[in-house]
């Protein structure tokens, strides 16, 4: 069947159905609005309520680290899942209570995960309240000087 199709279309222009042509044309129109490498980042609408993350002052350090390990692996976007889970596997066990609180504030105090990604990759400047020792450590981790493959999350 495929051989017949190839033979029958050689030397002829392949005609797309009318519906496919209009869909293709509408997709071509959309490409003129962005340029390659441009970040499309819109502000949140003012009517969108962003809930405050609850502070847990009485949470034991080990429980907090376990929660952060889980939250670093389940971000909802693969890019941050890979970056944060490998970062936590490497550094979280050595964090003291203050560093753990800084990391908790970093991943739970931000309302948009793309912000964490852009700050960690130095695509956008990090705001002063998040420019901490932990963010600098994360930025170094993202640079991947050791050239470690990070195509999957580390085992638990």
From Swiss-Prot:
It is found in: Mitochondrion matrix. GO terms for biological process: mitochondrial electron transport, succinate to ubiquinone; mitochondrial respiratory chain complex II assembly; protein-FAD linkage; tricarboxylic acid cycle. Keywords: Chaperone, Mitochondrion, Transit peptide. One of its GO terms (cellular component) is mitochondrion. Residues 1-24 form a transit peptide. InterPro entries: SDH, SDH_sf, SDHAF2. Its main location: mitochondrion. Plays an essential role in the assembly of succinate dehydrogenase (SDH), an enzyme complex (also referred to as respiratory complex II) that is a component of both the tricarboxylic acid (TCA) cycle and the mitochondrial electron transport chain, and which couples the oxidation of succinate to fumarate with the reduction of ubiquinone (coenzyme Q) to ubiquinol. Required for flavinylation (covalent attachment of FAD) of the flavoprotein subunit of the SDH catalytic dimer. Interacts with the flavoprotein subunit within the SDH catalytic dimer. Belongs to the SDHAF2 family. This is Succinate dehydrogenase assembly factor 2-B, mitochondrial. It comes from Drosophila melanogaster (Fruit fly).
């Amino acid at each position: 069947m495929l051989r017949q199709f190839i033979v029958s279309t050689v030397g002829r222009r392949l005609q797309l159905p009318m519906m496919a042509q209009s869909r293709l044309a509408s997709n071509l129109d959309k490409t003129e609005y962005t340029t390659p490498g441009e970040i499309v980042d819109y502000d949140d609408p003012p009517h969108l309520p962003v809930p405050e993350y609850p502070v847990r002052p009485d949470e034991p350090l080990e429980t907090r680290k376990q929660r952060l390990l889980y939250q670093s692996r389940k971000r909802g976007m693969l890019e941050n899942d890979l970056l944060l889970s490998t970062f936590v596997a490497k550094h979280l066990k050595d964090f003291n209570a203050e560093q753990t609180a800084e990391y908790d504030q970093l991943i739970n105090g931000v309302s948009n995960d793309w912000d964490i990604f852009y700050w960690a990759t130095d695509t956008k400047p990090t705001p002063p309240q998040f420019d901490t020792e932990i963010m600098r450590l994360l930025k170094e981790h993202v640079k991947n000087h050791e050239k470690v493959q990070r195509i999957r999350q580390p085992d638990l």
